[in-house]
A protein has these predicted regions:
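Membrane-embedded transmembrane helical bundles of large multi-pass transporters/channels
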Residues: 1-36, 100, 129-396, 539-777
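Loop-to-helix "switch" segment enriched in basic
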Residues: 37-38, 400
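Membrane-proximal amphipathic alpha-helices
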Residues: 41-45
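Structured non-transmembrane domains adjacent to transmembrane bundles in polytopic membrane proteins
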Residues: 46-67, 74-165, 396-619, 630, ...
Length: 777
């Protein structure tokens, strides 16, 4: 921040405060409605699964592209009068809804797959019309209200357990739970963060300011996400990312600013001058730290997947807002408050021990005398933590993907009683004949039958619903005869063919329903196998275009796309970070060491994620029902991108203080001990806040949010303890004066004890921006 900008902000401090208050008030209504414009699956990528979904929606007269499954469990069989009356009442109620295109129940189709073996559980399908399918998730409350209305009219309905499930219902509940997780995480983390801030500042007023900045940053960012959703599809998980990152960096940056302001007051400056000085020094450090986080989020934009791009956009917005608040609103408020931020005085005296450097000096001194021993101990711990990473398996988690206890999840469990849970998310195989041909022509019908028979040989497949699986025991020759007269076929199987055969008879659909014992992880293997079979050439389907889609296939496409671009993302972040550090410190070893340490903290976080979630060691502490068996692909990509930026803040802080002491004394060992002891309490406070904010989301009901929250919390913990307090200073001791080569030659250093010729302003030291970070703290 320039001196002119600093003076301008302080001069017009009341206007700055009024402007931000106005923006925050205007942001509240949109922030409150942000969940309404977010989606669980944002789509939009030109993948095979997206092509299959588009064909299903566009080619069939009454597509079962989006449907609700209503489950009924009762104390009596479906043939009893009360059960039959309830089923008829529910289906009639939904048929009256304009958004419902068709309803199929056991009473309509007499399909045994719709009823459990004991005949006490059934389900029926309510399919949305083409127009309603465009906003399928938003219609879940309408369907549930129709069900509740029908239940209220029948006294005997109270003896039955009824749930609304299906993909739109699951997506709606995911969005609802995600919003609840965000609110719950904020409610838990803010009070705990307040305790850490009081401990760090020894003052109630000073502790309150960072919390205010964090809350305003989240509110304004939610409003910006609401506006951005009109131009770019936004994932529902943006809620959790904005909340986590907003609170974390907002409070962290404010901690830096308030700490510097109090230091300037203690040096005798007035409130306005102290605020101006804080902006010019700590403000520059905040901007630099913010840029390192932005680099990580910006790198995610190279991945053309709407889910990751929307998360990246949300992260960019909240970091930018947090930085702006920290360098404008916060110093303006500090200039107004002045000495009032230090109250009450007795609290500062009570907590003075926390800030005394002697508390950390014994550790710094021991590490200075035994750097090799510290490096060896730290290396063994790091190896033990990162070892599980070798067993990392990327995929859709087998358990806990959907939040437990919701209406849709309970309905999915009811489907297991029938053996039909796979109906909710079938693998959808769309086959389209060449232009001018009929997919149900005799040549293609035999190929369809071969493909269906091949798919059903896999024990993970429960059944296939298609135009060649209408009735058991029917041969391909009989199907060829049936479809030789399409009008006759539609007259006989009209309802089914309207969903599985296009009007021009060119396109058909196969729904592959998996067994209830098939996990999502194994289902991804089934998708890849079906694609291999179809692309390998099925006799009779040589000229047919095959597209495999559905929820699981979308997960396969997302994973392949992200993993294919992950090396580029890693390279971009690592190279950019290394260049920034090389320019800041004029050193070769420092950026290499910093990048290696950052990679180690990320690897350690991944190792613990694998241990706790994939293998289930201690997973019950986070509410897991069992091992997930795989880690969702978005988690390692996002954790790497975010942690690399966040951890750099602590690295720059520690290295800058060491460099400042080295420039003053010319003694590397003394500089390392001094830098470590001087920064330990601040790093501890800042990291504790981050760990609290991220850690509270480790107990969310959404598994993907748990994974991200746990990964970020663990990474910050490892970075602030094992990395910054043990390994980094140990390596600094061992490298000696070579740390600063070529900016400072090992033989060209100041004499021990030599001071500077003048009081340096931020940016004047060899460390440049990094030096300003040190002075800021």
């Amino acid at each position: 921040m320039t001196a002119l900008a600093a003076r301008t902000i302080v001069r017009f401090r009341h206007l700055v405060i009024a402007g931000w208050v106005t923006l925050a008030v205007l942001a509240v209504p949109r922030a409150a409605r942000v969940a309404d414009v977010l989606s669980v699956e944002v789509g939009g990528v030109k993948t095979e699964s997206e092509r299959a979904y588009r064909l299903v929606r566009e080619e069939f007269p009454q597509p079962i592209a989006n449907f609700f499954a209503i489950t009924i469990q009762g104390p009596m069989p479906i043939d009893s009068a009360p059960f039959a009356a309830l089923l008829d009442s529910l289906t009639a109620s939904l048929r009256r809804e304009p958004i419902i295109a068709r309803v199929v129940s056991y009473h309509d189709a007499r399909d045994a797959s719709l009823v459990s073996r004991d005949r006490r559980t059934t389900f029926f399908i309510a399919s949305l019309g083409a127009e309603a399918s465009k906003t399928a998730t938003s219609h879940a409350p309408v369907v549930r209200q129709a069900v509740e209305s029908a239940v209220a009219r029948l006294r005997q309905a109270r003896d039955f357990e009824i749930h609304v499930t299906g993909a739109p219902a699951l997506d709606y509940d995911v969005r609802t739970v995600s919003l609840a997780d965000t609110r719950r995480g904020e409610q838990r983390s803010v009070p705990l963060a307040a305790v850490v801030l009081i401990l760090a500042f020894g003052a109630l007023v000073a502790a309150l300011l960072p919390l205010v900045v964090g809350v305003i940053a989240i509110t304004c960012s939610f409003a910006l996400v609401y506006l951005a959703a009109a131009f770019h599809p936004m994932s529902v998980f943006v809620l959790n990312i904005v909340s986590m990152i907003g609170l974390g960096v907002g409070i962290d940056y404010s901690l830096l600013m308030v700490t510097r302001f109090r230091e300037e007051l203690n040096r005798g400056l007035g409130a306005r001058d102290a605020a101006t000085r804080t902006i010019a020094t700590a403000g520059r450090a905040v901007v630099t730290s913010g840029l390192t986080v932005v680099v990580g989020f910006a790198a995610l934009l190279i991945i053309p997947v709407p889910e990751t791009r929307s998360i990246a956009l949300g992260g960019l917005l909240v970091v930018a807002v947090a930085v702006l608040l920290s360098v404008t609103l916060l110093p303006a408020g500090l200039a107004v408050l002045g000495r009032a931020i230090d109250g009450p005085r007795w609290l500062a005296h009570l907590l003075a021990w926390y800030h005394h450097p002697l508390f950390w000096e014994p550790w710094a001194r021991w590490l200075g005398f035994h750097p090799l021993r510290a490096l060896a101990i730290g290396g063994v711990i790091a190896a033990a933590i990162t070892w599980p990473l070798a067993k990392l398996r990327i995929g859709l988690p087998s358990t806990g993907w959907f939040p437990s206890g919701t209406d849709a999840e309970q309905g999915a469990r009811a489907l297991e009683a029938i053996g039909s849970r796979g109906v909710i998310e079938p693998i959808r195989v769309v086959l389209q004949a060449p232009s001018g041909s009929r997919i149900v022509g005799s040549r293609f019908v035999r190929g369809l039958a071969r493909l269906s028979d091949t798919i059903q040989t896999d024990p993970r497949v429960a059944r296939v619903r298609s135009v060649v699986d209408l009735e058991p025991g029917t041969s391909s020759l009989q199907y060829a005869f049936l479809y030789s007269d399409p009008a006759r076929a539609r007259a006989r199987y009209g309802d089914f063919l309207s969903a599985y055969l296009s009007e021009d008879n060119r396109t058909t659909l196969m729904d592959v329903v998996l067994t209830d014992t098939t996990s999502l992880t194994d289902a991804m293997d089934v998708v890849r196998w079906i694609r291999a079979v179809a692309n390998g050439g099925v006799r009779g389907l040589d000229s047919v275009q095959v597209s495999v889609g559905g929820f699981v296939a979308s997960g396969v496409d997302l994973q392949d796309d992200l993993l294919g671009r992950f090396p580029l993302l890693i390279g971009l972040i690592v190279v950019t970070t290394a260049i920034m550090l090389a320019l800041a410190y004029r050193s070769v070893l420092v950026p290499l060491k910093a990048v290696a340490m950052n990679c180690l903290s990320v690897a350690g976080a991944f190792g613990l994620i694998v241990l706790v979630f994939q293998h289930g060691v201690g997973g019950h502490l986070f509410g897991l029902r069992g091992p997930t068996e795989a880690i969702y692909v978005v988690v390692p990509v996002l954790v790497f991108a975010v942690v690399f930026g966040l951890s750099m803040d602590y690295g720059v802080f520690l290295l800058s203080r060491i460099k400042e002491a080295f420039d003053r004394t010319g003694r590397n060992d003394q500089a390392t001990m001094e830098g470590l002891s001087a920064t330990a309490s601040t790093i501890t406070s800042a990291a504790a806040i981050m760990i609290i904010v991220f850690g509270t989301f480790s107990f969310a009901r959404m598994l993907v949010v748990q994974l991200i929250g746990f990964g970020l919390a663990v990474a910050v913990f490892l970075d602030a303890t094992l990395i910054r307090m043990v390994l980094a200073p140990a390596i600094m001791h061992i490298a000696g004066r070579w740390n600063w080569w070529p900016g400072v030659h090992p033989e060209d250093v100041p004499r021990a004890g030599a001071g500077r010729s003048r009081q340096e302003e931020p940016g004047d030291s060899a460390a440049g921006t990094a030096s300003s970070t040190a002075s800021a703290r």
